Swiss-Prot record:
Its main location: membrane. ATP binds at G108, E109, S110, G111, A112, G113, K114, T115. Residues 15-713 form the Myosin motor domain. It comes from Mus musculus (Mouse). Gene3D superfamilies: 1.10.10.820, 1.20.5.4820, 1.20.58.530, Kinesin motor domain, Myosin VI head, motor domain, U50 subdomain. This is Unconventional myosin-Ig. Interacts with calmodulin; via its IQ motifs. The lineage of its organism: Eukaryota, Metazoa, Chordata, Craniata, Vertebrata. Residues 830-1023 form the TH1 domain. One of its GO terms (molecular function) is cytoskeletal motor activity. GO terms for biological process: cell gliding; cell-substrate adhesion; establishment of localization in cell; exocytosis; Fc-gamma receptor signaling pathway involved in phagocytosis; phagocytosis; T cell meandering migration; T cell mediated immunity. Keywords: Actin-binding, Adaptive immunity, ATP-binding, Calmodulin-binding, Cell membrane, Cell projection, Immunity, Lipid-binding, Membrane, Motor protein, Myosin, Nucleotide-binding. It comes from the Eukaryota. Unconventional myosin required during immune response for detection of rare antigen-presenting cells by regulating T-cell migration. Unconventional myosins are actin-based motor molecules with ATPase activity and serve in intracellular movements. Acts as a regulator of T-cell migration by generating membrane tension, enforcing cell-intrinsic meandering search, thereby enhancing detection of rare antigens during lymph-node surveillance, enabling pathogen eradication. Also required in B-cells, where it regulates different membrane/cytoskeleton-dependent processes.
Amino acid sequence: MLAVGRMEDEEGPEYGKPDFVLLDQLTMEDFMKNLELRFEKGRIYTYIGEVLVSVNPYQELPLYGPEAIAKYQGRELYERPPHLYAVANAAYKAMKRRSRDTCIVISGESGAGKTEASKHIMQYIAAVTNPSQRAEVERVKNVLLKSTCVLEAFGNARTNRNHNSSRFGKYMDINFDFKGDPVGGHIHSYLLEKSRVLKQHVGERNFHAFYQLLRGSEDQELQGLHLERNPAVYNFTRQGAGLNMGVHNALDSDEKSHQGVMEAMRIIGFSPDEVESIHRILAAILHLGNIEFVETEENGPQKGGLEVADEALVGYVAKLTATPRDLVLRTLLARTVASGGREVIEKSHTVAEASYARDACAKAMYQRLFEWVVNKINSIMEPRNRDPRCDGKDTVIGVLDIYGFEVFPVNSFEQFCINYCNEKLQQLFIQLILKQEQEEYEREGIAWQTIEYFNNATIVELVEQPHRGILAVLDEACSTAGPITDRIFLQTLDTHHRHHPHYSSRQLCPTDKTMEFGRDFQIKHYAGDVTYSVEGFIDKNRDSLFQDFKRLLYNSVDPTLRAMWPDGQQDITEVTKRPLTAGTLFKNSMVALVENLASKEPFYVRCIKPNEDKVAGRLDEAHCRHQVEYLGLLENVRVRRAGFASRQPYPRFLLRYKMTCEYTWPNHLLGSDRDAVSALLEQHGLQGDVAFGHSKLFIRSPRTLVTLEQSRARLIPIIVLLLQKAWRGTLARWHCRRLRAIYTIMRWFRRHKVRAHLIELQRRFQAARQPPLYGRDLVWPTPPAVLQPFQDTCRVLFSRWRARQLVKNIPPSDMIQIKAKVAAMGALQGLRQDWGCQRAWARDYLSSDTDNPTASHLFAEQLKALREKDGFGSVLFSSHVRKVNRFRKSRDRALLLTDRYLYKLEPGRQYRVMRAVPLEAVTGLSVTSGRDQLVVLHAQGYDDLVVCLHRSQPPLDNRIGELVGMLAAHCQGEGRTLEVRVSDCIPLSQRGARRLISVEPRPEQPEPDFQSSRSTFTLLWPSH
């Protein structure tokens, strides 16, 4: 049994050798003993240098998770026991250190654990990146991790060799920014085994997605899809109805997996409508598989009459694909053909033809669905808003998880392509690890003992050779008009490859009874002999589907389904180019994949399947030995023991490590780069672990590189500070010079603008001294910002100068009136219609014989007495008024305003003083906006005085402005503000009571008078 233990930092000798390179004797027996010992001790990982050998334990081991990731993060390969995390970390560090694309190639036969290995690699990369928790990077990481779950549902199935076998090839590129955080990705898929949709071997299942839909969906959803929960009801899922996804984990039920896939699709970014469309397409495929065709009795087989046994299924398919039912039925029973004259002919199917078309449609629908899912994930993972000029060049880590070598009881076209793919990858491994390495040693003049290995190039050539290769012969058979059968194709292969050492058939080897005449051929692959049945080769290679189905599904109302069939928009009469065959497309994709991998720095994970029964803790020595042999692991160990861990051109080596040696920093003065490298290594004491080639340095041990990297890492912060200091100083000097230039330009430009502005001012104000306007209508030019305060001051000075020019000829006796009018204009602010500006102001109207002919002498006597008593200096204003008191009674009174007091006088009693209010107590007055003479005087500590100026000559003369102006001018002279309010409804206060007063014009009113109500006063004003 497999010993399950926790991963320790170091491994003792009881666990065997952690690296096969360290074996004392390099034989197959020693290799297998070490592999078996480590497997029994729970050590499923072993190195061959930097290549990781992984044995599938078929059980969960406590080797993974955040704690294990922390132990491997930032470490070198030899510092921790062998692990997938170590390989992922090495690929990630190589990418960051050298800014070079890397790839991790995971290979091995079906069931060896490749898919699980790729998951752990993705988990490690996601865990060690994005320490700053950038939202966009987190989004990309979530999509990368969750995409595996979705692709497994649609691309994996249970086989007899593997409970979760990838039935497609997957290569994922992960894009990283200059900080090493993932910013995007792209998934390439290869050769989905779509024939599995129709039929599976005994003990196998269809793709997981079908069973997850049936067993994991809610009853209401299944009812809407016209589905039953039992997979045995449907032809396409009946074979695997009694099987589960896997046996290792009880949680791996279809129901729980369906929930996980739905959550993953939500996180990735599939909309609810898109998920619903996916379920409808899966349901339509299941219903399509249950459609049976029968010949109609009335027509008979000779007339080709055909009908569907259960037309309800046609309705289900039509509803789920959002297409017309009649069109679905017609497409299933017949096909349309365009003749040479562009005439469209409808040709009815036979039962066999209709069944073939139905199956082709089901396979194509699932393939298009799978491709759409992959493209959807790619569109979401695509790097967004990446500009190499700003963000730097992106680097890439590629992860290849592709189907392993397969040998089934009956091997068809799919197994042929899968095994060809594995031959190509093995050829790449041979080229990079064995062949190119030995050739480089010879080219560089390094002493080397040649190691023999099997080169599978001849097998690859057998498959892909132009004109004569198996794929070329198959394409020729597909393109030839006439009754070309699989048997004729086999005969052609026998003719072309009769003498090929890796090809055989029953015709060429009649004694080999493992093959049937006219059906089988055999290829001696690097992994073993595989017999292929040619039945279905031509049909699967053509991969044909009637155009009627493409047009039908393209015209679907469902936008998701419609997007999967862009080729359906072609008209039936349109002549199209023959599409490339499935084999050619796969070959081209493999060539492109190998070229892509060859352009990157590779890291290898070689997966081994311990036994055929998928039993935990059991290692079948013979089965594992066979895998070790065909994977070339022993040869890999030999090359590694005799070879070097790293090689670098001298200039590149110096560029990276020259700062660690005083003779090479910053630039060496030695004869050549090779001499400089030698001096650098001698200073570190590492010259014994290297070999000098013609143009490259070869380093034997990874520890040498680690030593140099550690020295470099210690010096980098010092160099960075030095560079930062120099660069910041340069930037500061550049900035200072730029500022000086800016200020010089600003200074001269400012002078220019000031000079131009002053010249313009001088030009405009040349005629400002000419009377009578003195420049009143001149427009001031807009000044530069720097001159705005200066111009504001100039405008004030100009206004004062102009005012001086206007008033200097006015007699001194009129200046009091002028100042009062100016004060009135400012106080009223244009809110009153007429305020007597155009007439002369007499001010003291009670002393005037014109206004007060009968009592002017009496007022003069009273005025003299008041002047002697109160000591005021001048009379500001006097007039007869009509006043209203708090008792709502109106009386004739006189108003006298002096420079010290405001007097209310009684004209009927020789102008006796009724009230005297100190002028400093007067805080404001209120007037209306009309021509009436109402005024309310407000004084602090006194009732408001409500009066109407009247008994003037001429009658109703407008004297409100005169009162306002004289009082406002006097207050200005004393340095205080008089509040003047203009309102048609004036509030007032008398003995604490609040009232309102307004004006009502009346034509019949002979003289102004007051009318009162409970809380209001109204001035009745003659309007004639």
